[in-house]
UniProtKB/Swiss-Prot annotation:
This is Arginine deiminase. One of its GO terms (molecular function) is arginine deiminase activity. Belongs to the arginine deiminase family. GO terms for cellular component: cytoplasm. It comes from Bradyrhizobium diazoefficiens (strain JCM 10833 / BCRC 13528 / IAM 13628 / NBRC 14792 / USDA 110). Pathway: Amino-acid degradation; L-arginine degradation via ADI pathway; carbamoyl phosphate from L-arginine: step 1/2. The active site is at residue 408. PANTHER family: ARGININE DEIMINASE.
Length: 420
């Protein structure tokens, strides 16, 4: 208990990719994943339906293995339950989610009344799991509900399910001493930042203790989209951000300017990547395994062009220059290292592509040289072990069906710096 109290009082902040992981937020599989069907999983950004019971078991195993390594793991359903138990928190979420553009003008009051009647736990489950017209009680619906059911069927959603909350990395990201509240690319994920932001604003563990560098989920950011899988605070004032399928140059420039204005970072290294589903974020092709060791998918990373933002005395507050060195060398130089040890996702071209599809490069560090990785990527895990990395395996058969691994499934809230 004394240790838990000490961890809860520690200042929030993520100061490296490999320092001791102290506190992390996850979101367990649940009702939202039971909504996945062969006809809707593509729209909801999953490649297949999940065996939900097994996904829950495997996620619990991952959480327990992190706790065994001293990590304080907090779960989003639980945090949201405690947040909506606070009247101001519940009101803020419903004010921003139960709106005419989402629900339809004729059902706003009815849906709001139904949600207000739920217990905090049921409301949290519903906000993540969604509300279909089939779920919605006839007593609350009236003629508009009959119209919606007649026109769209019983699987029409008044609030959409959010199965991608499983990948907590993307919705918000902690960069040194503060956090960004991200604007996500695909419509299937647009509601997620509201829930995470409410936790930071109203939950007693976070309220009044969070520095927000950038982002406001209550407004439309247009083309400025940012997802946490592209963001890595690697240390020494440097931040890596992937310019990818889901993170735009508009957002990167705004985040860089905000960080520089608040003296939260000294350099933002932009990794210009191809826009591919199999390489949707930087962390799907490049992650750290130790203070001086990275795992990468060479077919993509060897073709990344690096650009660097630095503070400048101009109207934008920043300047951008192309880095002439290869991307990995740019990262090493930024950390003051002569070079990084590089482990490539291995095998022939077929194995490399399969490993990439199975999130083989998506490691998350518990501490320097200790990583969590999917068990199925046996060849790459063996290469890591030969390099002296301790690989703790987690089962990825179900959890990876949305194309994310351990790095994607964790939102670090507190992580130690590394002495470079």
């Amino acid at each position: 208990m004394a240790k838990q109290a000490s961890e809860s009082n520690r200042a929030f902040g993520v100061h490296s990719e490999v320092g001791q992981l102290r506190k992390v937020m996850v979101c367990s599989p649940g009702r939202a994943h039971q909504r996945l069907t062969p006809s809707n999983c593509d729209t909801l950004l999953f490649d297949d339906v999940l065996w939900v019971e097994n996904a829950k078991r495997d996620h619990f195993d991952f959480v327990q293995k992190m706790r065994d390594r001293g990590v304080d793991v907090v779960e989003m359903h639980n945090l949201l339950t405690e947040t909506v138990a606070i009247p101001e928190g519940r009101k803020w979420i419903l004010d921003n989610q139960v709106v005419p553009d989402q629900v339809g003008l004729g059902l706003v009051d009815e849906l709001r009344g139904y949600l207000e009647s739920l217990t905090p736990r049921d409301l949290a489950e519903t906000l993540i799991g969604g509300v279909s017209t089939h779920d919605f009680p006839d007593a609350h619906g009236g003629e508009m509900l009959k119209l919606v059911r007649e026109a769209a069927g019983m699987t029409e959603y008044l609030l959409p399910p959010l199965p991608n909350t499983l990948y907590t990395r993307d919705t918000t990201c902690w960069i040194y001493g503060g956090v960004t509240l991200n604007s996500l690319y695909w419509p299937a994920r647009h509601e997620e930042p509201i829930l995470a932001t409410a936790i930071y604003k109203f939950h007693p563990d976070f309220a009044g203790k969070v520095n927000v560098w950038w982002g406001d989920p209550t407004r439309d950011h247009g083309l400025a989209t940012l997802e946490g899988g592209d963001v890595m605070p690697i240390g020494k004032g440097n931040v890596l951000i992937g310019l990818s399928e889901r993170t735009s140059r508009q957002a990167i420039s705004q985040v860089a300017a905000a960080l520089f204005k608040k003296k939260a970072a000294e350099r933002v290294i932009v990794a210009a990547m191809p826009k591919l589903r199999a390489a949707m974020h930087l962390d799907t092709v490049f992650t750290f395994a130790d203070r001086d060791c990275v795992l990468l998918y060479p077919d993509i990373v060897n073709n990344i062009a690096a650009f660097s933002y630095r503070p400048a005395d101009n109207s934008a507050g920043l300047e951008l220059r192309k880095d002439e060195k290869p991307f990995v060398d740019v990262v090493a130089e930024a950390l003051g290292l002569k070079k990084l040890r590089v482990v490539e996702t291995g095998g022939n071209a077929y194995m490399r592509e399969r490993t990439q599809w199975d999130s083989g490069a998506n490691l998350v560090c518990a501490s320097p040289g200790v990583v969590f990785a999917y068990d199925r990527n046996t060849y790459t895990n063996t290469l890591l072990r030969k390099e002296g990395i301790e690989v703790i395996t987690i089962v990825g058969a179900e959890l990876g069906r949305g194309r994310g691994g351990g790095h994607c499934m964790t939102c670090p809230i507190t992580r130690d710096a590394v002495d470079y």
